[in-house]
Amino acid sequence: MGANRLNITWHDRVLTKGDYLKRNGHQPLVLWFTGLSGSGKSTLAHAVEEELFRKGCYTYILDGDNIRHGLNSDLGFSEADRRENIRRIGEVAKLFVDAGIIVLAAFISPYREDRERVRALFEPAEFIEVFVNCDLAVCESRDPKGLYRKARSGELKQFTGIDSPYEVPFSPELVVNTACSTVKSGVQSVLAFVRDRGLINGD
């Protein structure tokens, strides 16, 4: 693989992020929603995208389950595969950001180190980690896919929160506690954060 890379040359793009900013009217960025299964990551991400779209923003959602149907269909749930899953998503998100898009990435992304590696791909203001905080007991009570039940019975191995760890972010840009707040209030928190930092228009 190393020898093959010697024959690969990076081709610089003609259009810049500044060009996209002038046209789109907003900064490109990644909203990285992380948390336990059942915490409400995807629900919140989709609701935020609806509001951003309504405001005229250019957006795209990268969702954990959807990605595993295609791009990452070759990966399982071992620690190594989970790390590779997040690495690939980070690279895909970077391509979208380079094209001026607001990316909403909803992934358990259980390992702190992996999230920080993704963060390192972006300029400081381009990566916003949103910790979707929800107690394990509440996530289990929701269990929309029946995964906790399978994990507790031993049918499903290496399930985050049961027999595989979730490493809580040390200093996320934003925390949304979905155990005690509505989706609407969560959306308002996210939008207020990006608006107050001048990343999207204030209207």
Swiss-Prot record:
GO terms for biological process: hydrogen sulfide biosynthetic process; sulfate assimilation. Pfam families: APS_kinase (PF01583). GO terms for molecular function: adenylylsulfate kinase activity; ATP binding. Keywords: ATP-binding, Kinase, Nucleotide-binding, Phosphoprotein, Transferase. It is an enzyme of class 2 (transferase). The keyword Phosphoprotein applies. The keyword Cytoplasm does not apply. Pathway: Sulfur metabolism; hydrogen sulfide biosynthesis; sulfite from sulfate: step 2/3. ATP binds at residues 35-42. The active site is at residue 109. Its EC number is 2.7.1.25. InterPro entries: APS_kinase, P-loop_NTPase. It catalyses: adenosine 5'-phosphosulfate + ATP = 3'-phosphoadenylyl sulfate + ADP + H(+). NCBIfam families: apsK, PRK03846.1. Belongs to the APS kinase family. Catalyzes the synthesis of activated sulfate. This is Adenylyl-sulfate kinase. The gene is cysC.
